[in-house]
């Protein structure tokens, strides 16, 4: 099966997209067909053995629309959207320009028409149109002013009547029928006036002079055009997030070829070329720094505002800005392979898909226009049957036609999805489909892989303990690194890295060897070995320290000199700075949080306590992670799985929503529904919050679209005329129809201002750091509880005390909270590990002042 993208022309409403989708789905050999009204495109999977691309184009053409294979599919030139200036944003801009031009001329002629028809109603008359004898000239002038408006908006008629002939009426059909009915009514009245004038029947002339509908036809088309203009302008803004990324890619790049610095077009840079990037320039392709240092602004890709330092070996990405410095970098990924191109491709893929919540709107869109036509016909017949005059019945029928709006239904979901995924991309969150975007908001449980997700996945030296009087900590670290330098074990590499960072230097080690549980070497004539607790022999002090370090979740290695234990070097996989904050946010949202790890139970629980996780599944094999996810689902939970490694891929695929850390493996990213570019766990919270915001926005849009039609059509049909006297002029109906689509698109645009709560407070990071420092204490110290009285200034109402209570209750280790407004204090029961710094930072985050903390 081949996945293809087609550009579709001629669609104006949800009925159009439903018609195209139905026509293509009927072809044998096509599946997963999705038509996007907002983007005017279609994606599908094609079986080459059964069907050709031309067959798809013919099916769309037969349905009354145009289709062409997108250039990126038909011409694999390697150029990407980042390198093609004829982007979707520019197409939308061209549409906006053309719509604006039509609108301005329509408004001009419509204004002239309104002047001669409306001013006499307020006493401002024109002598050359006064009197029954001049009424035919007055009517003919209205006709002449209306004709340019019809010509300017001829697309409504050509598309609308073509769709009617093809038995697939759409919004254009409704507008065309409404405007045509008004025009025909006016032309009939004009002929009646001419015949009556010839017969000298001036009363008939006067009567029909006040029942011309030329102004209605012109106003219907102009107001619909006005709505289309606002809609086109809003559509152009929905792609801002991605189009801004596209615009950041420079047109040229400087490369070194044949020993000389040369400027070439960015799309001619090849893998292996050496780039030269200076301060203030944007990087054209992905690469790795081979010379120099720099500060790079990566906010375009990651959403992070602070520049990132780059040195030799650091990776750089296309579209990022060189804040300061000068580097040479080797191009590693160009064209469609760059990170930026992949981000845009993922966003494009997501916006081309459909959210499950849109299915009801799709089903209704397929029958909406025929039902409206039937309602308009029934409206006219019923009113004529009950004795109303033909003109009144026709007015109501035209109102029904022009007020009905399938556009709002068709735009409700894709606009919210497009703006939401674009905003997510700016925050460094990539949703692969609209379904993932919707499902993410419905999760009830979060399962986290430990290594690389909660922790950095890179061990560091945390403790150096010396048990020999002739050694210092620095000496012990130097000895340990000198022995471990030839080992490939991650802990050995952490020790060597720590020695180099502390500039201890290394001894010359000889006769390196290893055996189960330890490694050994000879340094300065002495035998040194490093390994597990078996090397501690029966040294009580060392065994006790090993126990303490183990309870803190650290892996301790014993260092021996001539078979005598002289010290301990402990390593640990450090917790990410934002892990505790993210987990607190998930729990505050009412989600169940679990952690999976292959580590032993003691280490796993130590890490879990440090970040506030209550449920831990330790010593789990990679193959069993998916089973844990499935078991959680069987308990009724909708699971979000977050991981980064190859061994997480089955679990990511099994979960309701799989979320991959961006720094993870390609396999994990491939299996995931969502990718976190920044590798930050707080971005998972942002994804959850944004998903909820998008789903709420879609539901608001759908409600408005359904509510508008449910109220507007009966009012236009005159249902309330006999009881309340309510009826709608076709011009008002046309204005309402236009504004309904504008309201839907404008509501979706509010998502551009979405701000995740995890990025609102800078002080929260200091809170996390303080909490992590507290949890490095041994287990037996952590189990003690105490009472603390926190004096607080700034609380004035129950809302204030409630906010303090809620914030303190969320802290790991706090067992009870009692806040008194009268005494201006909070009394808490907590474990000894909850430090004053943590408490103060938590309350300060709420904009209250802590004046004192007393421990009892």
Task: Please annotate each region the language model reported.
Residues 144-156, 163-166, 180, 203, ...:
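Hydrophobic alpha-helical transmembrane segments
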Residues 31-46, 54, 211-214, 243-337, ...:
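Conserved cytosolic catalytic loops of P-type ATPases
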Residues 122-136, 165, 184, 423, ...:
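Membrane-embedded alpha-helical bundles of multi-pass transporters
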Residues 13, 20, 24, 44, ...:
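Residue-level signature of catalytic and energy-coupling elements of molecular machines
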Residues 64-70, 78-81, 85-87, 140-142, ...:
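Actuator/coupling domain of P-type ATPases
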Residues 1-137, 235, 260, 341, ...:
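Flexible metal-binding regulatory segments at protein termini and peripheral loops
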Residues 2, 18, 525, 553-555, ...:
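Conserved ATP-binding TGD loop and adjacent catalytic N/P-domain core of P-type ATPases
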Residues 461, 465-589, 601, 613-629:
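P-type ATPase nucleotide-binding
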């Amino acid at each position: 099966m081949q996945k293809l993208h087609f550009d579709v022309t001629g669609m104006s409403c949800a009925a159009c997209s439903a018609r195209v989708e139905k026509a293509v789905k009927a072809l044998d050999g096509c599946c997963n067909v999705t038509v996007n009204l907002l983007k005017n495109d279609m994606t599908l999977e094609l079986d080459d053995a059964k069907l050709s691309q031309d067959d798809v184009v013919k099916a769309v053409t037969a349905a009354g629309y145009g289709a062409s294979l997108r250039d990126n599919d038909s011409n694999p030139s390697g150029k990407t959207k980042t390198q093609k200036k004829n982007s979707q944003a520019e197409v939308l801009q061209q549409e906006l320009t053309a719509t604006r031009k039509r609108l301005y001329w329509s408004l001009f002629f419509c204004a002239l028409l309104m002047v001669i028809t409306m001013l006499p109603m307020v006493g401002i008359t024109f002598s050359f149109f006064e009197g029954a004898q001049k009424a035919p000239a007055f009517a003919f002038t209205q006709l002449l002013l209306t004709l340019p408006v019809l010509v300017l908006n001829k697309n409504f008629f050509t598309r609308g009547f073509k769709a009617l002939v093809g038995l697939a009426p759409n919004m254009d059909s409704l507008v065309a029928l409404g405007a045509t009915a008004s025009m025909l009514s006016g032309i009939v009245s004009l002929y009646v006036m001419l015949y009556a004038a010839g017969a000298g029947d001036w009363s008939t002339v006067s009567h029909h002079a006040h029942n011309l509908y030329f102004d209605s036809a012109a106003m219907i088309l102009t107001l619909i055009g006005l709505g289309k203009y606002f809609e086109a302008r809003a559509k152009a803004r929905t792609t801002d997030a991605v189009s801004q990324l596209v615009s950041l890619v420079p047109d040229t790049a400087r490369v070194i070829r044949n020993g000389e610095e040369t400027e070439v077009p960015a799309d001619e840079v090849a893998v292996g070329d050496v780039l030269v990037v200076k301060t203030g320039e944007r990087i054209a392709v992905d690469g790795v720094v081979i010379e120099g240092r720099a500060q790079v602004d990566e906010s375009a890709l990651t959403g992070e505002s602070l520049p990132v330092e780059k040195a030799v070996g650091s990776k750089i990405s296309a579209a990022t800005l060189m804040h300061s410095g000068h580097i040479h970098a080797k191009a590693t990924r160009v064209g469609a392979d760059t990170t930026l191109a992949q981000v845009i491709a993922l966003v494009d893929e997501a916006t081309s898909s459909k959210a499950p919540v849109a299915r009801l709107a799709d089903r209704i869109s397929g029958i909406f226009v025929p039902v409206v036509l039937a309602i308009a016909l029934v409206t006219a017949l019923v009113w004529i049957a009950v004795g109303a005059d033909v003109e009144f019945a026709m007015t109501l029928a035209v109102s029904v036609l022009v007020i009905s709006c399938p556009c709002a239904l068709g735009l409700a979901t894709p606009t919210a999805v497009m703006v939401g995924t674009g905003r997510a991309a700016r925050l460094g969150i990539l949703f692969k489909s609209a379904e993932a975007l919707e499902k993410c908001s419905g999760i009830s449980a979060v399962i986290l892989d430990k290594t690389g997700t909660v922790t950095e996945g890179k061990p560091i030296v945390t403790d150096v303990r010396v048990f020999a009087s002739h050694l210092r900590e620095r000496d012990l670290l130097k000895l340990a690194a000198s022995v471990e330098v030839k080992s490939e074990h991650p802990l050995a590499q952490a020790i060597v890295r720590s020695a180099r960072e502390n500039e201890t230097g290394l001894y010359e080690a000889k006769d390196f060897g290893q055996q189960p549980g330890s490694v050994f070497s000879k340094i300065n004539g002495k035998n040194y070995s490093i390994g597990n607790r078996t090397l501690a022999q029966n040294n009580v002090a060392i065994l006790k320290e090993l126990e303490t370090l183990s309870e803190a979740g650290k892996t301790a290695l014993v260092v021996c000199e001539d078979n005598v234990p002289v010290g301990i070097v402990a390593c640990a996989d450090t917790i990410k700075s934002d892990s505790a904050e993210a987990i607190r946010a998930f729990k505050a949202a009412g989600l169940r949080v679990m952690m999976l790890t292959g580590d032993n139970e003691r280490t796993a629980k130590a890490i879990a306590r440090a970040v506030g996780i209550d449920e831990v599944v330790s010593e789990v094999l990679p193959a069993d992670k998916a089973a844990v996810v499935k078991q959680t689902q069987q308990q009724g939970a909708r699971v979000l799985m977050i991981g980064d490694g190859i061994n997480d891929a089955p679990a990511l695929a099994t979960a309701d929503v799989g979320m991959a850390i961006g720094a993870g493996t390609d396999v994990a990213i491939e299996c995931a529904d969502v990718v976190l570019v920044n590798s930050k766990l707080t971005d998972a919270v942002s994804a959850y919050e944004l998903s909820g915001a998008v789903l709420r926005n879609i539901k608001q849009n759908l409600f408005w679209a359904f509510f508008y039609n449910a109220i507007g059509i009966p009012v236009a049909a005159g249902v309330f005329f006999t009881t309340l006297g309510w009826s709608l002029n076709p011009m008002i109906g046309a204005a309402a129809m236009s504004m309904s689509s504008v309201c839907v698109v404008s509501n979706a645009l509010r998502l551009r201002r979405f701000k995740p709560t995890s990025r609102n407070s800078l002080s929260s990071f200091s809170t996390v750091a303080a909490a992590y420092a507290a949890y490095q204490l041994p287990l037996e110290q952590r189990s003690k509880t105490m009472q603390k009285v926190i004096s607080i200034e700034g609380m004035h109402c129950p809302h204030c005390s409630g906010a303090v209570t809620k914030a303190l209750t969320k802290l790991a280790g706090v067992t009870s909270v009692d806040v008194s407004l009268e005494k201006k204090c909070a009394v808490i029961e907590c474990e000894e590990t909850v430090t004053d710094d943590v408490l103060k930072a938590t309350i300060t985050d709420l904009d209250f002042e802590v004046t004192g903390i007393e421990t009892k």
